[in-house]
Amino acid sequence: MEKSLHLEIVTPDKLVLSEQVDYVGAPGFEGEFGVLPSHIPFLSALAIGSLYYKANGKTHHVFVSGGFAEVSDNKVTVLAESAERAEDIDIDRARKAKDRAEQRLAQIKEKVDHARAQAALQRALARMRVRGNA
């Protein structure tokens, strides 16, 4: 049995992470899922939230804003709309985004705008939670 697996997180703009890890936990649409070495292959849609991984006895957190995770051949590949390591998150920017989204939610009448504001609020809150784990 393998002792580690490879985790790769990619966005349309860049490669965010490429490391050997011991465990991956991710926010799936149906709930959080975990992947250990030698896991069976599967594909899952990702929700907005905190992906975390364990490597060398430490837990690391990465904000992901949707996308997909593929598990195959002892590798987890995450294709995310956006992703940021916890230590790279600008907490002031996240707080300002949260405040803007809450203001829009208080004013919005149309459902389309409401959904966009709600998604922006979810992203801001998730970034703040992930940054709190750094």
UniProtKB/Swiss-Prot annotation:
Keywords: ATP synthesis, Cell inner membrane, Cell membrane, CF(1), Hydrogen ion transport, Ion transport, Membrane, Transport. GO terms for molecular function: ATP binding; proton-transporting ATP synthase activity, rotational mechanism. One of its GO terms (cellular component) is plasma membrane. F-type ATPases have 2 components, CF(1) - the catalytic core - and CF(0) - the membrane proton channel. CF(1) has five subunits: alpha(3), beta(3), gamma(1), delta(1), epsilon(1). CF(0) has three main subunits: a, b and c. It is found in: Cell inner membrane. Produces ATP from ADP in the presence of a proton gradient across the membrane. PANTHER family: ATP SYNTHASE DELTA/EPSILON CHAIN, ATP SYNTHASE EPSILON CHAIN, CHLOROPLASTIC. The keyword Ion transport applies. Belongs to the ATPase epsilon chain family. It comes from the Bacteria. It is a peripheral membrane protein. HAMAP family: ATP_synth_epsil_bac. It holds the Pfam family ATP-synt_DE. This is ATP synthase epsilon chain. The keyword Cell membrane applies. InterPro entries: ATP_F1_dsu/esu_C_sf (IPR036794), ATP_synth_F1_dsu/esu (IPR001469), ATP_synth_F1_dsu/esu_N (IPR020546), ATP_synth_F1_esu_C (IPR020547), ATPsynth_dsu/esu_N (IPR036771). CDD domains: F1-ATPase_delta.
